[in-house]
Amino acid sequence: MLRTSRRRRIAATALAVGSIAVLAGCGTSGGSSTPTEAVDELGDYEGEVSIIAWAGYVEDGSNDPDYDWVSGFEEKTGCQVTSKTFNTSDEAVTLMKTGDYDVVSASGDASLRLIAAGDVQPVNVDLIPSYEGVYDFLKDQPWNTVDGEHYGVPHGYGANLLLYNTEVVTPAPTSWDVVFDKAGDYSGKITAYDNPIYIADAAVYLMTHQPDLGIENPYALDETQFQAAVDLLKEQRQHVGEYWSDYLKEIQAFETGDSVAGTTWQVIQNVLAGEGATTDVVLPDEGATGWSDTWMISSTTEHPNCSYAWLDWIASPEVNGVATSYFGEAPSSDAACDYREDCEAYHAGDADYASQIWYWTTPIAECLDGRTDVECMDYSAWTEAWSEIKG
């Protein structure tokens, strides 16, 4: 039985990617044995599979006996699961380079690095029955498909929303201006996500409020566009009471009143609402950044059959419904909503809602919006600028 309450142990989807130099500077970790094409058929299960994932993605009942989707997989396949959690995409990329793990749950900021370095292999989605039911708007996306080649199976997705104190921030906001141009109204009580990727949030805002900048993609910023986003965040800094990456700290800040407006995840609002806090969330008119995670298979795995079995299992309706509910995000299919009670809160399957989300993507010098007459600022520049923004 699923429950709508959210425990404070639900994992934060922290994002802290490193320099994009890894894309150009690293070869494959598997040498000549690295698969360049997806497999055509599967064989017998190997009896084990090693998985690295965000906390809350591979639950065996040890954290909460009501949430266990590992035991059923082991019983069905005979593949014994060992798992390790990571806290950042940087950590995930580093761990996959060791070749010690078979499967990884990768956010969009990590997936392309893994693909470019040859650390993950193409996936034959025809061998994964559950893939057929996955929402179309999660398939064939830049973070999971390259040159028509699939590299994994979508898991869950969500938007970075605007959280606000309903008693303090009135009328109810519909724009990100409450944390940018109007941040002075709540100076010292604005909160922002503590990561260089937050520069994209400023870029999303500027797409609407400074259209002359010509920003078409918040992860594809030339020097002028990038500087405008950085300047906006430097102006915001004087009004920020706390930069957060630990979701528990944001919950506490809104409970105590230390924060009254800022970026958040739906799961944080769920926890606050469950505890009676006077808060609400909105996806502002300008749109928002967000995430879409992908299950991927190591290019050097010695357990491809168990790995494929996991990708099919975790995308199956009941398991995906339970797993994404536990974590606090929308599932990957309509069928998964039959096994959870809160799909409406997460706008699951709402393509129009999803179209307002700019999913996390690693910025690179080759502009992701297709421009070839300029060079865009890569993630190393974003990282350097973030240090300057915070001071």
Regions found by a protein language model. Name each.
Residues 132-133, 230-236, 275-296:
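Periplasmic-binding protein-like
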Residues 37-114:
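Early extracytoplasmic/lumenal segment of secretory-pathway proteins
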Residues 26-36:
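Bacterial lipoprotein signal-peptidase II cleavage site
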Residues 289, 298-365:
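Mature extracytoplasmic/periplasmic domains
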Residues 50-64, 105-253:
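Extracytoplasmic ligand-binding site segments that recognize negatively charged/polar headgroups
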Residues 359-391:
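Conserved C-terminal helix/tail region of periplasmic/extracytoplasmic solute-binding proteins
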Residues 110-113, 263-278:
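A ligand-binding cleft/hinge motif common to bilobed small-molecule-binding domains
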Residues 21-25:
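C-terminal motif of bacterial Sec signal peptides marking the signal peptidase cleavage site
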